[in-house]
Regions:
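Conserved GNAT acetyl-CoA-binding A-motif
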Residues: 92-105
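Conserved catalytic-core motifs of GNAT/GCN5-like acyltransferases
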Residues: 101-103, 119-135
Length: 145
């Protein structure tokens, strides 16, 4: 077997990220027959062009997965996070998603997500130490067959 080198890339860039993503999608398609994968990215931009918040994730297999949601501290509590979530959830439903999932932490936005209809289905203690990682989900619509 060929001698392969493991290379650390702290900022892998789009090409390497795409290499891994495309190959995982290919394996998932081979196992499930589901080939559609939609990246999700909604962002808050000021009139001056400043980026002040955003949401990233993807839709696959009937689910929206929210990777990250962030709103600049001074803008929190003014509905911007809800607007970003609304946009992502609508995007997902338009692509036949019936549910959404995300992770947050006990020190994070748990209450925000509960108000939006998300429920905790799993917990990982001491992630990081002294805190809990929360796995949450929400039904967006009906499963259609």
């Amino acid at each position: 077997m060929e001698n392969l080198e493991i290379v650390f890339e702290p900022l892998p860039g789009e090409a390497l990220t795409r290499l891994v993503t495309d190959n995982v999608i290919g394996v998932n398609f081979a196992k499930t027959g589901i080939s559609t994968w939609h990246s999700v990215g909604y962002f808050l931009r000021s009139a001056r062009g400043e980026w002040l918040g955003g949401l990233t994730g993807y839709v696959w297999g009937g689910w929206l997965h929210v990777n990250f949601l962030w709103v600049s501290e001074p803008l929190r509590g003014h509905g911007h996070g809800s607007r970003l979530m609304d946009a992502a959830e609508a995007f997902a439903v338009e692509r036949d998603a019936f549910a959404a999932t995300l992770e947050t932490h006990s020190f994070g936005a748990h209450d925000f997500y509960v108000k939006r209809g998300y429920t905790v289905f799993g917990r990982l203690a001491d992630y990081p130490p002294g805190h809990t990682k929360l796995f949450m989900r929400k039904v967006l619509g009906s499963i259609t067959g």
